Design a protein with these regions (language model features):
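Short helices/loops that flank or line small-molecule/ion binding pockets
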Residues: 2-7, 109-119, 123, 267
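Glycine-centered hinge/linker elements that transmit conformational signals in sensory
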Residues: 2-5, 46-105, 149, 158
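Short, hydrophobic alpha-helical packing/hinge segments within bilobed ligand-binding/sensory domains
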Residues: 4, 111-115, 130-132, 192, ...
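Bilobed periplasmic-binding protein-like "clamshell/Venus-flytrap" ligand-binding domains
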Residues: 4-23, 201-213
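Extracytoplasmic/periplasmic substrate-recognition and gating elements
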Residues: 96-101, 110, 119-122, 138-220, ...
Length: 268
């Protein structure tokens, strides 16, 4: 980050930066921390898909139950522990020292167009949902591919902070699921279940994976069509075929009410 921002400075007359992030006071700021800065620093306990008994949010859960008991260090949590303090300090330091001007006032939705402008050398972590935009043809205005559509970038392993130990999660990805409410009339529930089978069927899922590049089936990522397309996807296929994919996990069961907690988390 320091090398590109302070040593290289310019490439072909264009100012370049070694980092991209965002810092606007908005709910997505909370995502930035709980999604990966905290887990990469080593907040929480060893455990997959999330730490046990303390997850990457720093929330401790009673052993053998689904009862969260606290996030403060004084209550056995880690939300204000050394790893969390380190993560937020580094996020702030890198944002102000190495990211483009104005990044501190951007939110999640403003940072992606800035990233695809082509003058940011690297990002400490990103969401694979960005891939489709980053491999779009140059004719669409995307500056992160060459004239032949080959990515001018490469996905790399998530970096590890000083408090990270083997066996911890290391990154984040959303995991979709179908929720069928008991309160929904049975005939409608059956219809929803049938539709779900269609959506996750191999044929539909493979097509969806090629369009959105968000993989949900093992058969999708191992399909020969993805082997053929892999050179154009900057490491996405290799990542999802590697053991590292299990280190990227969604928010876990220690978080009792995500919408309510997410609303207050970023403000603190």
């Amino acid at each position: 980050a320091e090398y590109f921002t302070n040593d290289v400075k310019e490439i072909d007359g264009v100012r370049v930066y070694g980092h991209m992030d965002y810092g606007k006071r908005a709910p997505d700021l909370g995502w930035r921390m709980t999604d990966a800065w905290l887990s990469m620093a080593g907040a929480g306990s060893v455990g997959k898909p999330n730490g046990v008994p303390v997850d990457e949010w720093g929330i401790r859960m009673e052993s053998g139950t689904c009862n969260p008991v606290g996030a403060d260090v004084a209550r056995g949590g880690a939300a204000n522990g050394p790893a969390a303090v380190y993560a937020i300090r580094k996020w702030d330091e890198w944002l102000r020292s190495y990211a483009p001007p104005g990044a501190a006032s951007m939110d999640f939705y403003q940072s992606l167009p800035a990233l695809s402008s082509g003058n940011v050398a690297q990002q400490i972590f990103w969401y694979t949902a960005f891939t489709a935009s980053m491999v779009a043809p140059k004719s669409s205005g995307n500056k992160t591919v060459d004239d032949n559509g080959n990515p001018l970038w490469r996905m790399g392993p998530s970096p590890k902070g000083p408090y990270w130990d083997e066996g911890m999660k290391l990154g984040y990805q959303d995991a979709g699921s179908w929720t069928l409410f008991k309160s929904t009339p049975v005939d409608r529930r059956k219809a929803a279940w049938l539709y779900a089978q269609f959506v996750v069927s191999k044929t539909v899922s493979l097509k969806k994976s090629h369009v959105g590049l968000t993989i949900i089936r093992d058969s999708d990522i191992n399909h020969k069509s993805f082997t053929e397309r892999a050179p154009k996807l900057g490491g996405l296929v290799e990542f999802y075929r590697s053991p590292n994919r299990v280190l990227w996990s969604p928010t876990g069961i220690n978080v009792p009410d995500y919408p309510k907690l997410a609303q207050i988390w970023w403000q603190q």
